[in-house]
């Protein structure tokens, strides 16, 4: 089974360049604007798109992504509507990989089998579920793989040699290396430490390794992407979106462009990493 994620990383490998992976929250600041943002991301330079599933108790997320989730929930975003966004995006883009990222609770409430069937039918390619450890693979990971979805796992600086094989055992698509311990959007990542960590992970897997948490600028994206198969940017995009909203927290004419412009500059940074990596 080859997914859109496998295909995209295969293409990038042939081109000799890392991926820019972008994270946006479904339904932030509202469903219509959210769809417009999703639609402009590929042209702006996003190679893979992670879509956050809003949740009331996002314990691993920093203030920016928590606030984005609250805006989305306030706008009436549900898991069903998030899958609707994916379906609407797929009407005009059948190539860009889409990964749903979030917590297990909303999926559990939706019903695992129903969720996997609906996600696959909508055009979802993979899942990142931050609060399901490998010990609970039967809950969602194994059924997701059976349904033809990639299950992408997080590795961190505290994932030691003993733990790493368990983390990687049923991982597919790519590995998401969290470059700093703590919550999203906090301190910046150290490129040389990231490089050593990526090499350590690659000794255990042939999967691409993408690095996220703490990447906010084109320079940082370039430095990190040079050490890995991709750079993941989330909080910086959410901050750009938030800065474009009006006093009531609603979208303005500048909102979609604010996100697209930042993605374009980050993409230029990541594409510049090809030379840095050689």
From Swiss-Prot:
Enzyme nomenclature, EC number: 4.2.1.20
Pathway connected to this protein: Amino-acid biosynthesis; L-tryptophan biosynthesis; L-tryptophan from chorismate: step 5/5
Reaction(s) catalysed by this chain's protein: (1S,2R)-1-C-(indol-3-yl)glycerol 3-phosphate + L-serine = D-glyceraldehyde 3-phosphate + L-tryptophan + H2O
PROSITE patterns noted in UniProt: TRP_SYNTHASE_ALPHA (PS00167)
GO terms for cellular component: cytosol
Keywords per UniProt: Amino-acid biosynthesis, Aromatic amino acid biosynthesis, Lyase, Tryptophan biosynthesis
Active site (record annotation): 50 (proton acceptor), 61 (proton acceptor)
Subunit: Tetramer of two alpha and two beta chains.
Cited function: The alpha subunit is responsible for the aldol cleavage of indoleglycerol phosphate to indole and glyceraldehyde 3-phosphate.
Family the entry assigns: Belongs to the TrpA family.
Alphabetical list of NCBIfam families matching this protein: trpA (TIGR00262)
Protein name per its UniProtKB record: Tryptophan synthase alpha chain
Species for this entry: Rhodopseudomonas palustris (strain ATCC BAA-98 / CGA009)
